[in-house]
């Protein structure tokens, strides 16, 4: 089953329907939540435990944890940070039960000495429903608590992290691990919230599958089982033409490497054939570099392909190509604009557009409404900013919503690169990637991704699933490369060279499971 990702509103609706329609009492859900937290807390064998309880049901979860842990942990103290009249009904109930169990409860905040002596802290102050900025004494306390760097387990989401955007609402607790319920929330996966979440554990506490896997939940997580299900098959009885012919239109004076990386990545991702359309003036340069790739020298200006190359390009597309990778290092001028326009209007196969191609596209964006084939755009936030005239900082704050909106408005697949990479399609579905690392922030990494996605389209995946699987395997390859090279020394060529191992690791991990 594909793991969905939800907003605070969507999770609240799931919670409400579980209670009101399916008839599972809220106290039962709270008990299950507490048991799941306790399971993780006991891994650390704490002796001195502090529970920070807020006014809502998140606080109730924390108090229930204290009751369950009473005979399992030497010293437990619950700090109820808010007066009883401000507590939710379920939180009041848990507080009443905890008192009857004889658990020490303090209304107020722990002092520095108490924090210092604790070997584990449960953060149950605020949950996913928090919308306002944390201010005043609570904010001051959180800053003090963070300075102690104590082992901290967050209930549902670290207090102060927006569950919808990952933004910090004034102040936030920095957790070592977070135990969330039912489904992950956006704020767990978007920065800076991801940094505050620590290791994320998603626990099933009894929400009906009809709710957690509902088709109206449009955002999904790309995990390895899902990725494996998308991997193109490789039958024993087959031929190179079965695995597609990628047409790479890329490269110009000073940027031949971009074209080479795109082509090489397409081959490493499994393409049967790859041909590069290159400026004839650079023919010797490309011939000195290629082995498995083929080149098609075409008419050119002083530095780039010329509009005179268009007839040969369109003939090749019509007769041989299964997918097109357009843009890496191709240059930016009127001739390239004419070529791209013609491809969008008349190409018989899908086009993946990146880098210089996106810069050119920003000048002719309205042509997308008449596109003849499916289009995949792979911008980083700066490139998307040029396309849609929205500041980069706003794109970073609303990665999911903006990618989703642009995909729908332009009728294209958007691969918004970054952390996390977001894939969105015109019908509103969105996928968040789970692989990749900071070492991949290096020149050429995007060219590699373009080649991979174009390759997967040529092998028969839909442009959407080619993008989803391509982003995952690209990140996994980068993760393998970083184990050997580290983050600082990793280059785009390393990602290409470890692609075969990424495919092996993905399949072996699944095959080795019991």
UniProtKB/Swiss-Prot annotation:
Record's keyword terms, sorted: ATP-binding, Isomerase, Lyase, Metal-binding, Multifunctional enzyme, NAD, NADP, Nucleotide-binding, Potassium
Region of interest called ADP-dependent (S)-NAD(P)H-hydrate dehydratase, as start-end residue ranges on this chain = 223-514
Gene3D superfamilies under this entry? 3.40.1190.20, YjeF N-terminal domain
The UniProt entry's GO biological process terms, in alphabetical order, are: metabolite repair; nicotinamide nucleotide metabolic process
Cofactor dependence is on: K(+)
Q: Which residues bind (6S)-NADPHX 1?
A: 156
GO MF entry, a single one: ATP binding
Q: Where does this protein hold K(+)?
A: 58, 123, 159
**What's its EC?**
4.2.1.136, 5.1.99.6
Q: Where is this region: NAD(P)H-hydrate epimerase?
A: 1-215
Note whether Transport occurs among the keywords. no
What this protein catalyses is:
(6S)-NADHX + ADP = AMP + phosphate + NADH + H(+); (6S)-NADPHX + ADP = AMP + phosphate + NADPH + H(+); (6R)-NADHX = (6S)-NADHX; (6R)-NADPHX = (6S)-NADPHX
Question: Which residues are in the YjeF C-terminal domain?
Answer: 223-506
Residue ranges, annotated region (NADPHX 2) = 380-386
InterPro entries listed in its UniProt record: Carbohydrate_kinase_pred_CS, CARKD, Nnr, Ribokinase-like, YjeF_N_dom, YjeF_N_dom_sf
By sequence similarity, the record places it as follows: In the N-terminal section; belongs to the NnrE/AIBP family. In the C-terminal section; belongs to the NnrD/CARKD family.
Its biological purpose is as follows: Bifunctional enzyme that catalyzes the epimerization of the S- and R-forms of NAD(P)HX and the dehydration of the S-form of NAD(P)HX at the expense of ADP, which is converted to AMP. This allows the repair of both epimers of NAD(P)HX, a damaged form of NAD(P)H that is a result of enzymatic or heat-dependent hydration.
| Protein name per its UniProtKB record | Bifunctional NAD(P)H-hydrate repair enzyme Nnr
